[in-house]
């Protein structure tokens, strides 16, 4: 997709929720997956960059997304919201099922163009954040790291926090790193630039 203006980002809707590949949409539209810890702000990220308040439901209860949620954007692109990882109150068997479902999607879906890996800028990445980044690099899946909740940190400390995150991830300089805030609407254009570069 060459130009951002050809995509009406406000023309977006939730398409379907899927537990396995038999439920995936059967076409060749490009897909961007969104992965991150429970409550890292994935739903807020989706709502903010699409300019919609409640398209993706935000929840104060972590672990709410238990299926792959497919969002249709102007019939030209899809976002795929992946279940949040690292939520302790989910049973081991449920976590194993989610892991299997996520791995199947990420490694076998031809439509997948890139993964937006969301991390919390306030904290060093968790073990699961690092595992996800390593997994994507191992399978050579393009990754865009989006560091959320920047509004919770004074701007003068962003660089320091960014350095901590990058060091922990062993961040590849050829990947894109975006500082993001849904509250202050920071990083929206950079996110779209990075996404559209992949599709």
UniProtKB/Swiss-Prot annotation:
GO terms for biological process: division septum assembly. Mg(2+) binds at residues 43, 65. Belongs to the TRAFAC class TrmE-Era-EngA-EngB-Septin-like GTPase superfamily. EngB GTPase family. GTP binds at residues 36-43, 63-67, 81-84, 148-151, 180-182. Its cofactor is Mg(2+). Residues 28-199 form the EngB-type G domain. Keywords: Cell cycle, Cell division, GTP-binding, Magnesium, Metal-binding, Nucleotide-binding, Septation. One of its GO terms (cellular component) is cytosol. This is Probable GTP-binding protein EngB. One of its GO terms (molecular function) is GTP binding. NCBIfam families: GTPase_YsxC, small_GTP. InterPro entries: G_ENGB_dom, GTP-bd, GTP-bd_ribosome_bio_YsxC, P-loop_NTPase, Small_GTP-bd. Necessary for normal cell division and for the maintenance of normal septation. It comes from Streptococcus pyogenes serotype M18 (strain MGAS8232). Gene3D superfamilies: P-loop containing nucleotide triphosphate hydrolases. Disulfide bonds: none annotated. Pfam families: MMR_HSR1 (PF01926).
